[in-house]
Amino acid sequence: YLEDLKEIFAQIYTVTKDDGTLWIVIDTFKRDHAVVTLPFDLVQKLNSVGWKLQEIIIWKKDKTVPWSSKGFMQRKFEYVLFFSKQNNYKTNKDQVRIYDTQQLKKWWVKYPERYNPKGKALDEIWEFPIPVQGSWGTEYIRHFCPLPKEMVATMISISTDEEDVVFDPFAGSGAV
C-alpha cells in the first residue's frame, strides 16, 4: 500500500508546479492488536521522492465509530498532512486568518507580541463537523467519512489562487 502511494505521489510531484502543495488526510489504524503509524510511514516515503512536510494538522471530528474492534477508544481525529514541492511554496495564510473581534481582542490582550491586524493565524487543530453520508449529492460515492466541504475549501484557500488547477488523484473518493 505504501509503495503504491509513494509511486502515485511521485508521479504527482513531477507534474506539480514548483510552488505547489499537497494535502493528505490520513489516519492510523490497528493491525494484529498494534497501532500502525501510517501517516508517519507515508511521510518518510513522500520525503524520499521530494515532497517536504510543512505542517501536521489535527482534524478533530465531532463523531466517529469505535477505533478498536472492541470499542475501547473512539478515534476522534485524523491527520492532515501538508506538503510542499519546494521551500518557497504558495500559501495564502492571510486569507484564512480568524478575524472575530471578540476572539481577537481576548487573544491580543493575552499575547500582544503576536498581534496581527489581519487576524489570528489558524490553529493546528481544525474542528469541522463530519457531513452526513450522501450530503455531497447522490452522484458521489458514499464514503465512510466524507470530508467537510468547509475543510476542503480551507485547504484550497490556503494553497491556491483563483484560476489555479487543483488535482485530486483519487477523484473525490476520500483524498484531497
Model-derived segments and spans:
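Core catalytic lobe of class I
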Residues: 1-176
